[in-house]
Design a protein with these regions (language model features):
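Short glycine-/aliphatic-rich beta-strand segments at the starts of folded cytosolic domains
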Residues: 126-142, 169
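Short amphipathic alpha-helix segments
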Residues: 139-157, 184
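Terminal, non-globular segments
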Residues: 171, 178-180
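Short, flexible turn/loop "capping" segments at secondary-structure junctions
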Residues: 14-19, 129-130, 161-163
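Terminal alpha-helical anchor/extension segments at protein ends
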Residues: 117-122, 129, 189-207
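Active-site beta-strand/loop microenvironment that shapes enzyme catalytic pockets
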Residues: 76-124
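C-terminal regulatory domains involved in ligand/effector binding and gene-expression control
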Residues: 1-74, 194-206
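A common structural junction motif
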Residues: 44-48, 155-160, 186-194
Length: 207
């Protein structure tokens, strides 16, 4: 199953027997960044009694962490983590903060509530994949650029160009298309190979 991630923050809400569950799905590059977000929530929402969470990070190995934050063991963090795992989401985390409503939910009720609250914040999330691209750089003449501009723009609609005595061109190509693009450019330029990959970039692609 393909690993996915998110951009931007999305929120959800669940009420269960007068207890309110507010959930947040946020992109995170590190545990420190995710824990910083939780600390910020605690400072701004002191009336909440629990801030349960789960996060999955890949850089490059997979790291998973879940916290019940005072709820009975296994009733909060694990269900939240299960939601992330089912969607195969990485480099993001979910925090569910609870405002107690006066009625105990029991272990089964808590597990269900935290799971549903976690799912609710995913509903509006912008999900996608991080795709590897290569930045291609090269310097060519004006006549040569006229021969390949259309081809370059098929792969990058907004190539970067700097005009002088010659033209410096930079454009992005998906890594799985590099060999094809280089071959097409070589053919169009009569055997010349002015471009080469200089940098790898991971770019978000919506699904």
């Amino acid at each position: 199953m393909e690993e996915l991630t998110v951009v931007g923050r999305s929120e959800g809400y669940l009420e269960e027997k007068k207890s309110e569950f507010f959930s947040f799905l946020v992109p995170s590059k590190s545990l420190a960044e995710f824990e910083g977000f939780i600390s910020e929530l605690r400072q701004k929402n002191r009336e909440m009694c629990h801030f349960c969470s789960a996060v999955r990070l890949r850089n490059p190995t997979l790291v998973e962490k879940a916290s019940d934050d005072g709820e009975p063991s296994g009733t909060a963090g694990r269900p939240i983590l299960n939601v992330l795992q089912r969607k195969n989401l990485i480099n993001c985390g979910i925090v569910v903060m609870r405002k107690f409503g006066g009625t105990l939910l029991g272990t089964g009720g808590l597990t269900r509530a935290y799971s549903e609250a976690a799912q609710s914040c995913i509903l509006s999330a912008k999900m996608g994949r991080m795709v590897p691209f290569s930045l291609m750089n090269g310097t060519i003449g004006y006549r040569e650029w006229a021969k390949i501009e259309k081809l370059v723009r098929e792969y990058d609609k907004s190539p970067q160009t700097s005009f002088g005595e010659n033209i410096q061109v930079s454009f992005l190509v998906r890594e799985d298309k590099i060999n094809t693009v280089l071959m097409l450019l070589k053919e169009a330029l009569g055997g010349e190979e002015p471009f080469s990959p200089v940098e790898r970039r991971m770019i978000f692609e919506s699904i």
